[in-house]
Amino acid sequence: MSTSEIISRVWGGVLYMQFHLDRALSNQECPSFYVAVHRNSYLHNSLPAILQFFKPFLKDARLAQSQKWWFEFEKVPLKWNFPVGLLYDLVTTDAQVEKQMWEITLKYYDYPIEYVIPIDQNPSFLKDHWTNQLKEACFILNGSSKLVMNMSRTDSDDFYHAAIHKDSTQFESMFRKLLPSSVSSLKNLPIKVYLPLSNKLIQPVLSNLGRKITLGNLLQDLIPDLFPSSLMYTVAHPYSHGVVLPLDSSIIDLYICMKSLDGFLHISIKMIQKNEH
């Protein structure tokens, strides 16, 4: 499969979701809202459509104008600043994945500020977050975020529009402008590795990217207890966009093909269950 085909599949991946309205927000029986949500997006991208559906059932219809809604899955608050697919890979088990429908509760009161970043009422809060992530990714790649900071307003708006509307061709065209001209000029790669159970996040520091570093090499160096072999899965699997990543893949190639809309390659680690051996 070519690089462009993989990128197209990454951007085309969806999750089938069922949203329930928190019972405290309505005085009547409320149907669920069903929708296919792109993995490579944010939950709040879908909020306008969700609220439009639930507005007739709200005790206080004025709440539909607010952005300070939050989402919960099996009593676990979901981080709005994570891509949808990453959230799903982090919080679901194999048994839940088999259901093929992700059930989420839409909530408003008792915002979990100890776990989820508070939402600014500024209408551009999501774009501001995305831009900050892109600046960080650019800094990791180049040692400077100037390429993002010096973008014209038009280019910045077009870039965000491409990300939010899943225009992978336009997104890739603009993202290539942030990449160094050669592999030897890469300072590092924007990668985040999420460990199971502990909610711990690791951002590896890579050096000498001129040589081929495989995902197996990276994970064996970072977390040898979970990846004692750089060639075989023995304890855990690395996931991104819902698929198990091959350990022999070049980490640079993986980044180019499977980075998310925020410019990072997100890798979630899941323990291998006994029945998988």
UniProtKB/Swiss-Prot annotation:
One of its GO terms (molecular function) is Atg8-family ligase activity. Conjugated to ATG12; which is essential for autophagy. GO terms for biological process: autophagy of mitochondrion; cellular response to nitrogen starvation; piecemeal microautophagy of the nucleus; protein transport. It is a peripheral membrane protein. One of its GO terms (cellular component) is phagophore. The keyword Membrane applies. It is found in: Preautophagosomal structure membrane. The keyword Protein transport applies. It comes from the Eukaryota. Coiled coil: none annotated. Its main location: membrane. Involved in cytoplasm to vacuole transport (Cvt) and autophagic vesicle formation. Autophagy is essential for maintenance of amino acid levels and protein synthesis under nitrogen starvation. Required for selective autophagic degradation of the nucleus (nucleophagy). Also required for mitophagy, which eliminates defective or superfluous mitochondria in order to fulfill cellular energy requirements and prevent excess ROS production. Conjugated with ATG12. Belongs to the ATG5 family. This is Autophagy protein 5. The gene is ATG5.
